[in-house]
Amino acid sequence: MNLQKQQGALVISLDFESHWGVHDRIPLGKYRQNLLGERHVISRLLELFREYNIHTTWATVGFLFAETRDELLSALPTKRPMYANRRLSTYDEIKDIGNDEQEDPLHFAASIIRLIAAAPHQEIGTHTFSHFYCLEKGQDSEMFRADLEAAAAIADKYKISLESLVFPRNQENISYLSICRELGIKAYRGNEHSWVYKAKSREDETLLRRGIRLLDAYLPISGHNCYSAKVLGCSLPLNIPSSRFLRPFSRKLKIFEPLRLRRIRSDLRYAAKNRLIYHLWWHPHNFGKNTNENLTVLKDILEYFSLMRDKYGMESLNMRELSQKHIDRCGLNAH
């Protein structure tokens, strides 16, 4: 496998989940502004990505593909997760949603999905069908298989083939990777290699780890988290680990914003100079509040990436593009 000509690469993946992704964590009343703002944010993100020629993967919850409540109900798999903690189940939320996107824009997004699919260099991947938690008690591999099959079926209506996966809450479960491969997933976003980012169930997560991750956004605690293409290996699905979560702007932490930006610039420069991969991710709803401040930060990052592209030949690749380039180098049969 010849990796000598590999340039540095910026990979961006976005977890597009709307209310399905936060229903068990944040009361709707407290987060409604973020979720309603998400739709406007996505249009502005697409404009920025077009302006800077940024290739992005949008890992989208399958429920959002349904145009109506009836369509969603008809698309549900028969095997569903029976989480020990019932609060985690998105299925229990369906009874309370509206009939369609116009009535309930927090649970339907067909028009947004079409907007993304029509934009240049944007990949629509999967965030599972139901925002499926792969490390929680009460689910198993057959339930996961049924979930991914349902995601593929509803995406097929849009003529979208799902090839990239992001595990909800980053609950990476390596025992499910063979199922991903069987169902056509060629790449997934794994976690950073530091112990503070190791995949955990909600029950096993600790305040200490959360606190260190917060500090890591501002100070170089876990390092650059960039990596060589060799790390991807040569077996499907490829693990394209995250490097950094782009935390949303916080007025309480505003004084530290220069540190956060410097951290990401330093990562980008290191990746560009050393021909490494840098994988940045966030949720569109993170930008639904303080939208202008968040987009100003992102624009600064993309401006700096443009400098790295001009100076070192750094590329912008979505997960599908990176995995396909790597598959070609490895000589893998991806079918």
Regions found by a protein language model. Give the residues of each.
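Catalytic alpha-helical scaffold of carbohydrate-active enzymes acting on polysaccharides/glycoconjugates
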Residues: 1-164, 169-240, 256-280, 287-335
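Positively charged, amphipathic and often flexible ligand-engagement surfaces
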Residues: 240-246
